[in-house]
Amino acid sequence: MDARSETALRAEREAQFIANIGAFMRRDFDAIERSMRPDVVMELPGSSWLSGTYGGFAEVGRCVVALRRVLESDHTRISFLHEGDQMIVRHDIKVHGPNHEVEMTLRVRARFDEQGKTESITIEPDDLGLFDHVLNAVLRDSEAS
């Protein structure tokens, strides 16, 4: 791939990520789904009620909807690193719980197929222990309600 087309590919991937943030905040999960392969796999490490491996649109979609309950994001403070068929995004977010609002950086590692669709996603919070704590507090609060 020549340098110009590599630059264009990187710009497309970055633009799609930014567009997906907007879709995430608007709860337009169909728009996010269109950027993924039907057999997409998403991994979220940790010990929270959301951690695990999700496969396919339906499972990944349920995880994205659940993340929307606790994450706040905008288009600022994002950096991109490209390595072959993957893009690593460092993204500042807020995680909300019943008694918490914490800022942290989320690393999103996305791998792409030849058509430019996302085939795998790994979400890595900078402070996994705090991330899990806030998510589990949300679960406890919803169970108590």
PLM feature spans:
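Short, cysteine-centered beta-strand-loop-beta hairpins and adjacent loop/turn segments enriched
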Residues: 69-70, 95-103
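Short, low-complexity N-terminal intrinsically disordered segments enriched in polar/charged residues
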Residues: 1-34, 38, 138-145
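Hydrophobic/aromatic beta-strand elements that line small-molecule binding cavities or substrate pockets
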Residues: 75-81, 93-94, 105-112
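Hydrophobic pocket/interface hotspot
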Residues: 20, 32-36, 40, 60, ...
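A solvent-exposed, acidic/Ser-Thr-rich amphipathic alpha-helical stretch
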Residues: 30-84
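Residue-level structural signal for beta-strand termini and adjacent loop
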Residues: 55, 107, 123-124
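Low-complexity, intrinsically disordered terminal/linker segments enriched in charged
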Residues: 120-145
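A short, polar/proline- and glycine-enriched secondary-structure boundary/capping micro-motif
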Residues: 53-54, 99-102, 129-137
